[in-house]
Structures are given as C-alpha cells and as structure tokens.
Amino acid sequence: MTIKFLSESTINRIAAGEVIERPASVVKELVENAVDASSTKINIILERAGKNLIIISDDGIGMTDKELEIAVERHTTSKLDESDFLKIHTFGFRGEALPSIAAISKMLITSKKRGTDKAFQIKLIGGNEKQITISVHNEGTKIEIRDLFFATPARLKFLRADKTELAVTVDIVKKIALAHPEISFSLTNDSKNLLKLKGQNKDAETNLKQRIIDVIGDDFIKNAAYIDFKILDFSICGYTSIPTYNRASSEDQFLFINNRPVKDKLLQVALRVAYQDYLARDRYPLCAIFLQIDPQFVDVNVHPAKAEVRFHDPNYVRNLLIEAIKNALANKSHVTSTTIASDTLKLFKNPLINKQPTINKEVNVNSKSVDYRSYSSANTPKILQNHICQKLIDTLPHAKVEQEVENRIEHKQQIHKQYKLGAAKAQLHTTYIISQTEDSIVITDQHAAHERLGYEKIKSYIKMDELIKQRLLIPEIVELPNEKRADCLYDHREKLSKLGLTLEKFGEKSIIVTEIPNILGDVNVQKLIQDLADHLSDFSENVALMELIEHVTETYACHYSIRAGRKLSADEMNALLRQMENTPFSGQCNHGRPTYIELKLKDIERLFGR
C-alpha cells in the first residue's frame, strides 16, 4: 500500500473525532467562541439534546464575509499569533472547532460585524459546498448545526439516550456560565426552558455570588465559606462548602483556571487534602473555585478538549489551594449546615396538624358516653379549659429531675444571652445536651462534640511536639485477630513512638504496649490498639507520616472523648459548650457530621401553628 496525502475533508473528520465526541462537545466549542467574541447574551436551542439541531446565537463582534469564509478553514483564528503562544487568555486558539464540526454535520452560519451594514451567511454540508450569500441579521453570530454525525454514522452508535446527552450539555453550559456571570445565558431543549441566567453588572464578588445562587443554589451559598486569597500574581477566589454541607459524589465541584473549567486531578487532590480533617472519605465538599495564574505558568494545550492543564510548578499550586481553602474554612469553623435544622423540623411535622376536629352536632345529652374527641377546644369555655388542663397536669407523673442539677441550672439563667451555644438545660438519654440561647434551642451530641475537641487538642500537641508519654505500670499485652495486623503495627512502631505510643512485638499475633499518650488518661488500651490495627491494616510501611498522624489522631480522639450514655452535670455540660465555642471546627465531628443542631424559636412555634 502506497503512502498518500489525505483529502481535506478526511483530515477534518479525523480532527472532529478528537474534538467532537457528542452534542455537548459542539455546544462547548461554539459557546466558548461566543464568549471570546465579547458577547453579552448567548442563546442555545436544542432538539433531541442536540442530535437533530443545535443553534447558538450571540450578540458578539460578528464577522465580515471574508472572515466568515476563512473561519471554516482549518487552523484559522483571530485569537493567537506566534508571539503570544505562551500567554493564551481566550477559550479557543487552535482554529479547529468550526471546520471539525462542519465536516460531520450540516452547518449554517449567519453573522453581522459590529459597525457594519450587511450580514452574511455561509452554508456547508459535510464541510463542502461552501455558499456565501447576503442575509439579514442583528449584530452578532448565529450558528445552526443539523444532523450531527450524518457524515460519520458510526459515531451515532456511541451516543447515549437523549436524557444523558442533555445532562452533559447542561453541565457544560453551567460551568461556562459560572465563569462569566456578566453574560446572560439561555438554554432550551425541545421548546422546554432549562436555563435562563441573567447577566450581572455589579461588582465582581456580587456578580459571582448571584450566578452561583442561580446555578448551584441558595443553600450552597448559605453553607459556604468565601475564598479570597492572593499572593504575587496568583489569586484564588470563590466559595467552598462548610464540612457539614457535603455530598456523596464530587459532581458539584466546579474548578476553573483563568476562567476555564477544568477537571484536574492535582486540584481535586488538593481539595481532598484540605478537607481531610473534617470529612469522611466517602463524602465530598461542594465548591466553585477560580484560580487566576499567569498564563505562561500553565499549559492549556494538553488535549484538544482543553479540559486538562499542566502547571509549571504543580506543588506550589497545590499547596496554595490547600492553604486558601483551609483559611476560608477557619473563618466558618463554628458553623454547622443551615439545612440540618430545617430537615430536622420536617421530621417533627404532623400530617394532621392543619386538620381541625369537627363538632358532633348529634350529641345526646342523656347519653352516658360522650365522644370527647368530637369537640373543638374553641367551643369550650375558657374556665373549663383551664380546669381540664389543671386536672390533666395533676394526673401526669412528674419527671424525675435531680435537684442538684436543677438548682445549678437556675443559677445560670443568663448564660444563654452571653454565649452562642447558650446555657445547658438538660441531658437527653444521657447522650444529647439541650441548651437554650436567646432565640433558639441547641441540641448537642456530647460524644461527637467532645471527639472533635479531642481531635483538635491532640493535633495541636502533635504539631507543637508536646505529646507526653505515660509509662504503664504494667505493660499491656494485646492479642490481634491475625499476624498481618500485628506486623502492620510493628512496622509503624517508630512513627507511632513519635505519636506517644511505644510497643513491641510479642509472639506472632500479639503486641505489648509499654507507653501511651498522657492525654488519653485511663484509656482502654486493648480497644485502642485493636482500633489502630483496623485503621492501619491497609497502609504500607512507607505511608507518609502526615497521613499516619491523621488516622492515629482520629483513633486517639475517639478514645479520649466522653461516650454516649454518660451522665453529665450542669457544670460539665456548660464546660463542654464553652470549649466548643473556643475550638476551631467544633461544628462538625471528624467525619463531617454535625456536632450540634440549632432550632430557632420561630420555627418551633410554627410547628404548633402559632
């Protein structure tokens, strides 16, 4: 077989295979072109999720007839020249999108250059038969794509159901819209409105906040920390959720480099590391984070789809992102998710709360049996109501309340006006602390809260190298389920020694413990070592010290904390609440669950129809 040149149409179809995978790819390329054209309004119309028809119209700078003819040729662009290849600020720069799309569809472009009198139209079928005619159009450009992949029918077999393809397109438009809150976007499919976003023209922070509310939701903003981080020519801004507001997947993580939406592993790992102290490993934060970096320090020309980037100094970027997120979270470290209280109140709601009892008009006064349920309290004389209530109260068994606790609480009536978590009023099921603030009640999980306090305390001791060892009077021998777990602990013995735990191997499946961290006090050594072995069984000997510290600290904190089922005095409960108010990230446990929920008085009153 001889070597020969490929035809232009074949080259374009091959290029389309790299750039255009599905209707969403077409929408992405054309919307990005519209953004680069300084548009303020971008409208997207689809039929069958774009399989039959895609129309993108904008009010950008438009094109002349000559520019229109050149635009559909390969490697033609207005966005790049040889001198600024390392300083790319625009979405597009390859000059491949239009000819690649034209090669596999029926394309019609209508455009009018700003400041000119005439509009022009060009029609292409499979990238051929170019026809330019005079047309009528407002300033800007409209591109119609029909019968996508008609020239490459094999690609149609790989398309998913309309619903799936549409979801991908909506996600792409949302990402671009987040990066450009100053632009209005609309998206319809089969005449159904899916997105309608109004362009914002206020200051940058307000614009971004409103666009995030429109795209991600108001709940996210209410439960997010604002990021504003700058160092030299590098800046990070946006919003990231507080730990108690999380998801089971990473779908709601929006990351941008110079306003370009990216899916970069380095940034995703940095995000994960920033939350590792506050979230369980199967939970993910929500975020919309924008990194601005000098274009010469980031390469966006890694893949035709431009979803991946390469940094000149990846570790520098990673560390700055972690620092920016942690700083933002520190400013919201005592806050718990606002949705928790509303979800809790829903559980209390009585489905019969709005149903008023009706009066039985056929009551026989001579009857010995009267159905009291048929009477409305509104029809009972007040004096009788009070009499009935008093009688009822007199028959109720009084709650057993320890006089000592009651007296102590009475002396602290004003605490709820001074402190965020209020004054302790009671302990529920020896597990939850009920406290009162000026306008709410707070329910605190004593174990989760104290575990968080312990975690932060132990972590600070480790950081300051102040973790004191306590020698056991009688060394403890701990037998583990198998030799693997015993070997795992023994392999990490030097690192564990730095964390206050001294141990040696004792037989095949046993470990002998001679020293433990002093802060753990009278801890159950058997349970501590078994839990540590469970945590570390999947770790290699070469695991990083910081990662080991995280897992060991979690285990220490769990054994350090007071347990559910322990009765606390009023002083102990109030002491715990005061510690929470003065400890960072006390609003969530080590797994991202809330340590307390706050129920506003007005919401409680609403439950009773007040």
From Swiss-Prot:
Record keywords, A-Z: DNA damage, DNA repair
GO cellular component: mismatch repair complex
Gene3D superfamilies cross-referenced by the UniProt entry: 3.30.230.10, Histidine kinase-like ATPase, C-terminal domain, MutL, C-terminal domain, dimerisation subdomain, MutL, C-terminal domain, regulatory subdomain
Protein source organism: Rickettsia canadensis (strain McKiel)
Function in brief: This protein is involved in the repair of mismatches in DNA. It is required for dam-dependent methyl-directed DNA mismatch repair. May act as a 'molecular matchmaker', a protein that promotes the formation of a stable complex between two or more DNA-binding proteins in an ATP-dependent manner without itself being part of a final effector complex.
HAMAP family noted in UniProt: DNA_mis_repair
Annotated protein name in UniProt: DNA mismatch repair protein MutL
Domain of life: Bacteria
Family: Belongs to the DNA mismatch repair MutL/HexB family.
GO molecular function, one term: ATP-dependent DNA damage sensor activity
Alphabetical list of InterPro entries matching this protein: DNA_mismatch_repair_CS, DNA_mismatch_repair_MutL, DNA_mismatch_S5_2-like, HATPase_C_sf, MutL/Mlh/PMS, MutL/Mlh/Pms-like, MutL_C, MutL_C_dimsub
SMART domains: DNA_mis_repair, MutL_C
PROSITE patterns, per database record: DNA_MISMATCH_REPAIR_1
GO biological process: mismatch repair
